[in-house]
Structures are given as C-alpha cells and as structure tokens.
Curated annotation (Swiss-Prot):
Keywords annotated in UniProt: Hydrolase
Stated family: Belongs to the UPF0173 family.
Gene Ontology terms for molecular function: hydrolase activity
Transmembrane segments: none
Protein name as it appears in the record: UPF0173 metal-dependent hydrolase Hlac_1347
Length: 248
C-alpha cells in the first residue's frame, strides 16, 4: 500500500491497482503536485468544509465515497455520476472499492458544506482503508491505513478502531484550533495502536501552524508504540505490515 501526503488532509492511496484520493485540496503550501496528474478511481471525502472538498471538481470520473448528504451535494453541484451504492455510505459501513475495502468511522467535528456552513453534509467521518475486508478475526496479512479526518480525541479510537480495524498506520490531525493538537494526537497515536503515525492538517494557514517536533515528542510522551513520521509534502510512504507484505 502506497500513501502519499499532498499537504493538509489530502492523501493519495494506492492499493494494488486501485487509486483512492482523500479530501482533495491542493491550495496548500505543502504540495507542488499538479492535481491534473492524478486520476483516482475513488474520491473519499471526510466532510464538507472547503479545505476538504476544494478540488473535487477536477475528478468527475471518480466514484464518490462520502455520507449520503455530502454525496448528493457533490453530485448535484459538480456532476459526479458515480457513488458507492449509488448514494454514498454512512458510519460503520464497509464498501468494496476496487482492490480496497473502505470502512467509514466516526469523527468529532462540525460539518457544514463549503464556506457558508449553511447546508448539512451529514456526519463528519474518518476512513480505514484495507486490502482485505475487516472481520472479527484478526488477519496479520491485512494492511490498513486510518485517516482520522478532522477530529478531536474520542473514545471510539481505543474502543472500536484499534481492536476491530487494527490500523497499521494512521494519519492524525495535529494543527490544533480546529482539531486536536500535538498533545491530543500523541494520545491518539497510543490509542489507535498503529505501527506508524503521520501528522496532517497543519501549517496550511495561521491558526494551525505548529512545530512538528511537538508531535514527535508527544507521541513518545504518550508511550505509543507507533513510530512518528513527518512526511514532506508529496512524499510517499510504502506501508508494509509486520510480516513484510504491502498488500500486493
């Protein structure tokens, strides 16, 4: 599984022959990529704020993976014809997306659409992406990535996401102000039980500027087993599980 961070909360995930793009927003200082170079099969949207759906119009051909409310808005306003299940999905559901399985999980945040915040986009969400369908039986050959969306600390991280979905890697919002900051992200790194954790949703604009060394220190202070990794913009991390498989 290949994970590329394009700044803010935008991630390009490759699982075998399937490409997924999460929260496309390329108007951020961490990326130099030309958005037109990406051709995702699936467009995963955690919520409707403009810094998470800012570039959805570039990917009309992708299948939308979002709540029914946000899916309907995207289809009506940007012309996307395809959506998982024809109408989107909701918290707790798992859908097959090509070679990947995507589970929608809860996030604690607000969720108006665009900058007016006048239209409901349903519940905010996070996603757990795996190369196998999650079951109650632990599968050491499964590789999983947790994108937390915009959120603060929540008990679901330790009660549901860690024991059931068992993420190998997690991307955690770290910029504070609108989400949890480095201290909260450090605790989250411990709670989700991942092997590696990445900071995201920081340094895009003034209220969320941080020193990423704080994130690294807070992960260690929390006693998390995870390795904190601070990616450069547009950098790719190849995720392998503990048995050396990257899901191929």
């Amino acid at each position: 599984m290949e994970l590329t961070w394009h700044g803010h909360s935008t991630w390009h995930v490759v699982v075998d022959d399937t490409e997924l793009l999460i929260d496309p927003y390329f108007d951020n200082p961490k990326t130099d990529v030309d958005p037109e170079e990406l051709d995702p099969d699936y467009l995963l949207l955690t919520h409707g704020h403009s810094d998470h759906i800012g570039d959805v119009d570039r990917y009309e051909g992708a299948t939308v993976v979002a709540t029914p409310e946000l899916t309907g808005y995207i289809q009506e306003n940007f012309g996307h014809e395809n959506a998982v299940g024809g109408m989107g999905m909701n918290i707790g559901g798992t859908v097959e997306c090509g070679d990947a399985w995507v589970t929608m999980v809860r996030a604690d945040h607000s969720n108006g659409i665009d900058t007016g915040y006048g239209t409901s986009a349903g519940m905010p969400a996070g996603f757990v992406i795996g190369d196998k369908k999650p079951t109650q039986e632990s599968d050491p050959d499964c590789t999983t990535f947790y994108h937390a969306g915009d959120t603060g600390l929540m008990s679901e991280m330790v009660d549901v996401i860690a024991p059931y979905l068992e993420p190998d890697a997690a991307a955690l919002p770290t910029g504070d102000h609108f989400t949890m900051g480095p201290a909260g992200a450090g605790i989250a790194a411990d709670w989700v039980g991942a092997d590696v954790v990445f900071p995201m949703h920081y340094d895009t604009f003034q209220p969320i500027e941080i020193d990423t060394r704080e994130f690294v220190n807070e992960v260690k202070a929390a006693g998390a087993a995870a390795e904190p990794v601070v990616l450069e913009g547009d950098e790719t991390y190849v995720l392998e599980n503990e048995f050396g498989s990257d899901g191929d």
